[in-house]
UniProtKB/Swiss-Prot annotation:
It catalyses: a D-alpha-amino acid + A + H2O = a 2-oxocarboxylate + AH2 + NH4(+). This is D-amino acid dehydrogenase. Keywords: Cell inner membrane, Cell membrane, FAD, Flavoprotein, Membrane, Oxidoreductase. The lineage of its organism: Bacteria, Pseudomonadati, Pseudomonadota, Gammaproteobacteria, Enterobacterales. InterPro entries: DadA (IPR023080), FAD-dep_OxRdtase (IPR006076), FAD/NAD-bd_sf (IPR036188). FAD binds at residues 3-17. Pathway: Amino-acid degradation; D-alanine degradation; NH(3) and pyruvate from D-alanine: step 1/1. Belongs to the DadA oxidoreductase family. Its EC number is 1.4.99.-. It is a peripheral membrane protein. GO terms for molecular function: D-amino-acid dehydrogenase activity. Its cofactor is FAD.
Amino acid sequence: MRVVILGSGVVGVTSAWYLSQAGHDVTVIDRESGPAQETSAANAGQISPGYAAPWAAPGVPLKAIKWMFQRHAPLAVRLDGTPFQLKWMWQMLRNCDTRHYMENKGRMVRLAEYSRDCLKTLRAATGIEYEGRQGGTLQLFRTAQQYENATRDIAVLEDAGVPYQLLEASRLAEVEPALAEVAHKLTGGLRLPNDETGDCQLFTQRLARMAEQAGVTFRFNTPVEKLLYENDQIYGVKCADEIIKADAYVMAFGSYSTAMLKGIVDIPVYPLKGYSLTIPIVEPDGAPVSTILDETYKIAITRFDKRIRVGGMAEIVGFNTDLLQPRRETLEMVVRDLFPRGGHIEQATFWTGLRPMTPDGTPVVGRTRYKNLWLNTGHGTLGWTMACGSGQLLSDILLGRTPAIPYDDLSVARYRSDFTPTRPQRLHSAHN
């Protein structure tokens, strides 16, 4: 089968890999000059299934009001003048109750855990290297309330069979020795020992080369104008004066998927702007061993071989990609506060990217009402965490194979009022 994949970020490239390994003739189309040039270029570097959680959570609406007046707020909203933004925010607010939060987090963890296992299998099969580490993730709490609130997420982890450690402040240095100097600022942490880290861009670029060697065609510097459709199927992709045809089409354009699908399929994917700093390491002993997540500022600090990646924050501001100095100051403040000796901050590279976010935090993966159009988009801040699982899942669905995990509640159909998902199995049963 001939398959066209739109998008060469980590989600598009992993989709191409799994589909080509299944025997399909795959072509990837992207406007950029190479893979992983936009959202996948400089993300936080975390592969953290247990921390997969929607931004739409109980208490977020009130917190958002308080954050409006805080210099280092993790979330900011500026109206972009579109009705779509208002509708998306309303849908997000409707997911901010406990029932929706637990439901959304449960399916996100299910896919993320599966994806981490798919990555392990891929790594063993190919030997791909991407400055990866398997040292776990440590979520840091600065208040007693944050420490107490961790019990809510622990319930989901236990149901998913995800191992964890709830640590008091005095024990944080056991897993991250550099935190010994700042333990007095913290109340404790939640550690997930099975989480991983790695350079998403490096992984995507190297996997793209492997995919190309396996027969995948990459069409870079090729802007897509529109999808061509008739009745219940897509019959081509218009790129300038060329129409590229295939038997099946996969939408993996991230934040740009919504506009490309306008008039074809309605998906609630909106850009969530984030920032990162990439800092050269000065004192290895003063840098993190693996990756930490600051719960107060929603910022991750991740160790690569010779660099520290600091990433986070969320701005609901449309497609604005301006680099704002106050956001850099927030990233610098957090890394200086926790790892003051770790890196040469003055030499840091400042970056911003647009994460494709759904109102419920769960990506949109699966079929559409068009019999040859498939979706793999809307992964938000978890594209790196969920990419391999989403690619394998999509390949299985397209081939008519039964996937290893329940998947019907990942499709765009879940936004229909009459949608009733099948009851998921316990998550650990899918990847033991």
